[in-house]
């Protein structure tokens, strides 16, 4: 039975839905449309635009791995405020961040579309710059997406950078500090476990971000986004199932995961690709001090990794009851 939305709704709520629809469209289809449009322009009287952009693209080819190109006006678009209010999304600070230092922030969980990570670190809708004055956030994204013309410039303007060591080093070595490099540690593969009530994190063997922190002496900041996994339902794909096998194979081949998810639609609540209206609260933990070690041993990496997991668990346990998570529910790692 399809549950339709009321015919008469406040314009505020309609604008919120439109803002989220724009985000989902951008996440799922904008890169592909930009690529097709770029090629199609070659066969029109506007072919010169493609040539000029290609020249610009070549000259600017290293920018995504050199800190990107923050454009504050785009980060402050009103549409992001409507998107934030749709769920709503809020950002909680538990400790200060020193603006004279550079940080690595581990963001958990990925969720299906990484809504919390984008809203908090790539827009000013939740007031990141006011909550953490002097800190400029960046968020790592698969290098693949920066190969899409026009789309690359759009995502760079929000603070997204490539997920390469060179990209991380450029940000973490900036003199004067004031940079936070966000890494969604579980990555695209973790999206396959994103469903309501799931607290499984892909972290047990993810140690690259820890090695980065040791190499650059950057404090580690654990971040947990409560409600991230509640935004969509997902077709059952338990470990060992044929669907999960296919998804894992495609993820290894293409570098992106393909969760079969569904939420609600624009005019009805029963099915569609728009996330449910469920609150997201992103809690930023206290920094973990890291001693700079240019060539860390496996033991040093493992020790810091275990400490990070412990601090992340402490952060989750300290706040879970506020979000009606059962007392006997704990984070699970794979």
From Swiss-Prot:
Top EC group: transferase
Principal location class: endoplasmic reticulum
Recorded family membership: Belongs to the diacylglycerol acyltransferase family.
Organism per entry: Homo sapiens
GO cellular component, one term: endoplasmic reticulum membrane
UniProt xrefs under InterPro entries: DAGAT (IPR007130)
GO molecular function, one term: 2-acylglycerol O-acyltransferase activity
Name of the featured protein: 2-acylglycerol O-acyltransferase 2
Compartment(s) where it occurs, according to its Swiss-Prot or TrEMBL record: Endoplasmic reticulum membrane; Cytoplasm, Perinuclear region
Keywords: Acyltransferase, Cytoplasm, Endoplasmic reticulum, Glycerol metabolism, Lipid biosynthesis, Lipid metabolism, Membrane, Transferase, Transmembrane, Transmembrane helix
Record-linked Pfam families: DAGAT
Top-rank taxon: Eukaryota
Its membrane topology: Multi-pass membrane protein
Annotated transmembrane regions: 23-37, 38-59, 103-123
GO BP, one annotated term: glycerol metabolic process
Job of this protein: Involved in glycerolipid synthesis and lipid metabolism. Catalyzes the formation of diacylglycerol, the precursor of triacylglycerol, by transferring the acyl chain of a fatty acyl-CoA to a monoacylglycerol. Plays a central role in absorption of dietary fat in the small intestine by catalyzing the resynthesis of triacylglycerol in enterocytes. Has a preference toward monoacylglycerols containing unsaturated fatty acids in an order of C18:3 > C18:2 > C18:1 > C18:0 at sn-2.
Metabolic or biological pathway: Glycerolipid metabolism; triacylglycerol biosynthesis
Enzyme Commission (EC) number: 2.3.1.20, 2.3.1.22
Reaction catalysis annotation: a 2-acylglycerol + an acyl-CoA = a 1,2-diacylglycerol + CoA; 2-(9Z-octadecenoyl)-glycerol + butanoyl-CoA = 1-butanoyl-2-(9Z-octadecenoyl)-glycerol + CoA; 2-(9Z-octadecenoyl)-glycerol + octanoyl-CoA = 1-octanoyl-2-(9Z-octadecenoyl)-glycerol + CoA; 2-(9Z-octadecenoyl)-glycerol + dodecanoyl-CoA = 1-dodecanoyl-2-(9Z-octadecenoyl)-glycerol + CoA
Tissue-by-tissue expression: Highly expressed in liver, small intestine, colon, stomach and kidney.
Activity regulation summary: Inhibited by oleic acid and sphingosine, while it is stimulated by phosphatidylcholine, phosphatidylserine and phosphatidic acid.
